Amino acid sequence: LAVLWQSLGAADGWTLSHYGRFFSFTSSANLLATWNSVLVSCLSVILAALIGVPLAFLLSTFDFPGRKACSALVSMPIVLPPLVGVLAFVFLLGESGLVPRGLSNLTGSNSASCALTGIAGVVAVHGYSFSVFFFTFVSSALENRDTSLTEAAASLGAGKWLRLRRVTLPLLMPALVGAAIIVFMTSMASFSAPLLFAGELRVLSVQLYSTRLSGDLRLAAVQSVVLSGVSLAFLFALRYWNNRRRVTMATKGTRGRRRSLPRGLTRWLIPSAGFVVSVIMVLPHLTLVLLSFIKQGTWTFRSDAWFPAVFTVENYRMALSLARPLANSIQMAFFATLGNLVVGVFIGWLLAVKRIRFGNVVDALVMLPWALPGTVVAVNLLTAFSTGNVFSFGQVLAGSVWLLPLAYFVRNLPVVARSAQSAFVQIDPSLEEAARSLGAGWWLRFRRVTLPLIAPGVLGGAMLAFVTALGEFVASVLLWVPANQPISMAIFGEYREYRLEVAAAYGVLLVAFIGLVFFVSRVAFGSKAASEV
């Protein structure tokens, strides 16, 4: 509301002049940036679906040796924080990346002509990074479907394509819509990929950042409102369309089992395709590790060598000697997640157990930060806390060390609240009633009955919130101060200083720590918590 107020405000009252500046055809930079953002987001949804959906069908339908390894490798993009993933693509597909250098040596052409830049580069990064949403959502839907429906259609003479179009796809539509919403909104909010790959291409998230730095706060507020409006319009449009076409399963069939591979050439083509795609999905990770061991200055933008020749561990020594940013990120993510746990569990309890009045309104308000782009959340916080108010106990938080962890808290609260709500809903009320009948008080019932049942789901959501906050970049770029520099800004700083090898070492350390969090989640909290993450 503070940003909306600022976008309409003027020295002498209310005005729409700032919106007139945004939608002006004489200076169409903002309109062009909006159109480019929508175009990039739509193309990202299409490419992510083209990658993730076939992989989900392949790995959920057939059983073959190495299938679990392929599934794990296909899911690897989720452990790459946004900035680290984009940097890995710069080293792999940028003007001086491994692939353009290799093609240049093979063809004799300029490596820059073989690089992915502009809209193609941004969409490629988004398609790779966000395909995991389509893969995860569709895989879950396929594994939970009732195969008796397709068997009944087959018994009535329906062919494969007819069964796919009339039975399977309608049942998968909620998963497809959910993944499309997340990919579109994440692409609209994406900052690092357009910043490093777009070149002269204007997108609204980068335009908002530039406007904010120039000091034009009114126009930045308008850009925030428009960016939020586009994302929310897409969200509500897809949800409305999906609700009108909702299909449910009303049978007592069993979940289908994976089929063995057919005989003949297909028996070898299917696993081969799975392994090839899996290797492609981990190429950015391997590129990041490779670059982190290269000696600084021996493989630069001006070097003609396709592959580096001098390796060292000095980059890791330098990164570890300047480990304060990583410690800052861990500390801020920890306290933000701790707050998410306390507030999120309370909200989930109110919505699922107490079923308070206007619960739908509370649920929508809680989920709003997840629907808004990170840049908009950052601008909202800067605007709201640029002066003292009751929520900050009269203190000005803008420019302080407190605003960035607050952004992590606000941004990830919906994840923990929704996981807590789902966990509470799954508890059979008769369990707590039995404990009450035996004389157990509220605290004893919660500690011995409720808490063990909700712990896996809630801790899974908390782990996801922690990992997201740990590598957050979009809000950090607007809110960080030197005293709390996060790891993402340290990586970006090394990149801007052309110390790419140290930036890669930072990235590997961050990815390794996130992988450790995933491992601890699975070992300590079980597979349910890990699946939540």
Question: Which stretches of residues belong to each language-model region?
Answer:
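Juxtamembrane inter-helical linkers in multi-pass membrane proteins
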Residues: G159, R246-L261, G297-V313
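Membrane-water interface segments at the C-terminal ends of transmembrane alpha-helices
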Residues: L1-G13, T26-E143, V167-S192, L196, ...
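Glycine-rich helix-loop "coupling/hinge" segments at transmembrane-helix boundaries
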Residues: D12, F191-S214, T300-A305, F473-L500, ...
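Short cytosolic juxtamembrane segments of multi-pass membrane proteins
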Residues: L149, V247-R259, L431, A440, ...
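The alpha-helix within a helix-turn-helix
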Residues: A153-A154, A435
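A short glycine-centered flexible hinge/capping loop motif at secondary-structure junctions
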Residues: A48, L156-A158, L438-A440
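Helix-loop-helix hairpin linking two adjacent transmembrane segments in secondary transporters
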Residues: V206-V230
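Alpha-helical transmembrane segments of integral membrane proteins
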Residues: A237-A273
